[in-house]
Amino acid sequence: PVYEVSKGEKVLFIGDSITQGYGTFETGQTFVNVANRALDYELLNQGIGGYYFDKNSLMPLEKFVPDKVIIAMGTNLCYWDDKEKYIAGFFEKLPSVYGKTPILIITPLWRADYPDAFDKVCEVRALIEKFSLPLKNAKVIHGDLLVPHDEKLYFDKLHPNAAGGKIYGENLVAKIKEIKF
């Protein structure tokens, strides 16, 4: 016999190489997959290495209309002089694509690949908070609180390894439940 599989909410993850899972080298240990085992979403992971807040990439999907969107990126803009322009443009366009869809925005994780890296993460986080504030359908959580600031949890002081991905996913689930997203 064939049984129909029940599917949870449709959730679109938009992000960079961390969302894609680079650094874990174990598909099951990416934070997206760890979280999904507990949340049981029907998900589409659009994590792309090198991705940043590019408004031109925002467009409605025809074959996957999400019930929720989770955006997790920003670290690739840390050292860009014009990062504000990109972050502002992305969040200005976002309502035209996902204006009524609940959105969770995860700011960049802690990183230690350069001496001033975390200061740069905090700059990006402040810009994300500033430009997402007008969005009534969005909630922001600090990514640097989801993975401990411990180099042993990172493959290269930037991308979480399998242990870091597991912790990230578990902490994300707890946060999603806490804020009722």
Where are these regions (language model features)?
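Serine-esterase "nucleophile elbow" of acetyl-processing enzymes
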Residues: 1-65
